[in-house]
C-alpha cells in the first residue's frame, strides 16, 4: 500500500471542507459520474489512475487512508469501474467485463 496523498482546505466562499485525495503527478480521476465512487461502507474511494503506466483501478481510504492499486496488467477502460452494493468491483478491459472481489485481495 502507498501512503496517503490526502490534503484538505476550507472553501472560502462556502466554508465547506474540500478533500484532495491524490497528489501524484499522473492523471487520476473518478469513476463515471453516474456510478458510485465509494464502497458501500463509504470508507474507500475507488478511482482510476495512470500512475502505473496505464489506466488502472486504485482505492484510497477516506478521508486520509493509504492508496492501494487494485488492478494491474492490461489497461482498463478508464471510466468503467463500478461498485455493486455487495462491494464487488466491475470494470471493462479489452472489450470484456471483469470482476474483482476486493475482499480476496
Residue ranges of model-derived segments:
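Predominantly a core beta-strand signature of beta-propeller blades
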Residues: 6, 17-18, 65-69, 104-105
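Hydrophobic/aromatic beta-strand positions that recur at structurally equivalent sites within the blades
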Residues: 10, 60, 100-103
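Blade-loop segments of beta-propeller domains
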Residues: 27, 32-34, 54-97
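N-terminal low-complexity or amphipathic/hydrophobic leaders
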Residues: 33-42
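Residue position within the beta-strands of beta-propeller blades
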Residues: 44-48, 90-92
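Blade/loop signatures of beta-propeller domains
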Residues: 1-19
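Surface-exposed loop and turn segments in beta-propeller and other repeat-based domains
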Residues: 19-28
Amino acid at each position: 500500500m502507498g501512503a496517503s496523498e490526502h490534503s484538505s482546505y476550507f472553501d472560502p466562499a462556502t466554508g465547506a471542507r474540500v478533500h484532495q485525495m491524490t497528489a501524484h503527478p499522473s492523471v487520476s480521476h473518478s469513476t463515471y459520474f453516474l456510478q458510485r465512487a465509494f464502497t458501500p461502507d463509504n470508507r474507500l474511494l475507488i478511482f482510476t489512475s495512470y500512475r502505473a503506466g496505464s489506466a488502472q483501478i486504485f482505492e484510497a481510504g477516506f478521508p486520509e487512508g493509504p492508496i492501494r492499486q487494485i488492478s494491474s496488467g492490461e489497461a482498463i477502460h478508464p471510466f468503467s469501474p463500478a461498485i455493486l452494493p455487495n462491494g464487488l468491483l466491475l470494470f471493462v478491459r479489452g472489450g470484456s467485463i471483469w470482476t474483482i472481489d476486493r475482499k480476496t485481495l
